[in-house]
Amino acid sequence: MRQKLEEIKNSAINELKASLSKDQLEVIRVKYLGKKGELTQILRGMGALSQEERPIVGKVANEVRSYIEETIKEAFSDIKNKEKSIRLENETIDITMPGKKQAVGKRHPLDLTLESMKDIFISMGFTIEEGPEVELDEYNFEALNIPKNHPARGEQDTFYINDNLVLRTQTSPIQIRTMENQKPPIKMIAPGKVYRSDSVDATHSPIFYQMEGLVVDKGITFSDLKGTLELFAKRMFGDKVKTKFRPHHFPFTEPSAEMDATCFVCNGEGCKVCKGSGWIELLGCGMVHPQVLRNCNIDPEVYSGFAFGFGVDRMVMMKYGIDDIRLLYESDMRFLNQF
């Protein structure tokens, strides 16, 4: 029996030395130490031995078992270390090689233009005011002198949440909130998103950006309005840009006007973009209607003011020569990477 145990030990050692993988080690373990393994069978047969042989053989069998278990454990560790070394060698990074450049995004042309517009007005002493995009009917229409039956209040032009709440159609409500909460003199701009129930095409979008401005003080005249907007146009588009004012109608200003600028495509020569006129509509403006001032508890006999409003998307298109507003919202990297 002792000779058989020595044979098992030597056989196991030889097989372990020749093993190259964890799977082979597991096969050897099962062969000798498993439930039906060779060493296990000998241990189960010890009952047939004499009382004198049993403790001697049992001691040798346990020593062989412990030796095989320890040898398998060491072999597992050696193979694991070899695999780790091979993996590290294959995964070695050459730190002298140039790294991969991180893809860095760029600022959107809308954001760039908004910042330029803000900077110009801030340099002229304007403050920036904000307000909610979900607005009360009172602020979006009533306080701006837009009556119940006005066409702009129809569902074809306005997104209604309920009878009293709308998605703001302009940033003018911010002007009302500012006049309610601040005393003149007031000199502010209100940039932000607005919503109109428009079909999407090259010049229309249901969501777009607008910037409105308001000045209220004693002795404000249309000349102040004209000078402010002409200065803005020159700083935004260059000293060569020309502007002109045309009479218009807005319910919240009186008198009202629209300001045109020389076409950014043809420089005033006439083209398809400006329909041959050499001019492009830039903004709406006018003197604040006396009733709007009264609605905000400002006495129109003491104070006067002017207001104006830009479509920021239109400004972007003019500044960069873009002929389709949809390009600003489609997240096409071929387009956005140009800025």
Curated annotation (Swiss-Prot):
The keyword Ligase applies. Its cofactor is Mg(2+). Its main location: cytoplasm. Belongs to the class-II aminoacyl-tRNA synthetase family. Phe-tRNA synthetase alpha subunit type 1 subfamily. PANTHER family: PHENYLALANINE--TRNA LIGASE, MITOCHONDRIAL, PHENYLALANYL-TRNA SYNTHETASE. NCBIfam families: pheS. This is Phenylalanine--tRNA ligase alpha subunit. The lineage of its organism: Bacteria, Bacillati, Bacillota, Clostridia, Eubacteriales.
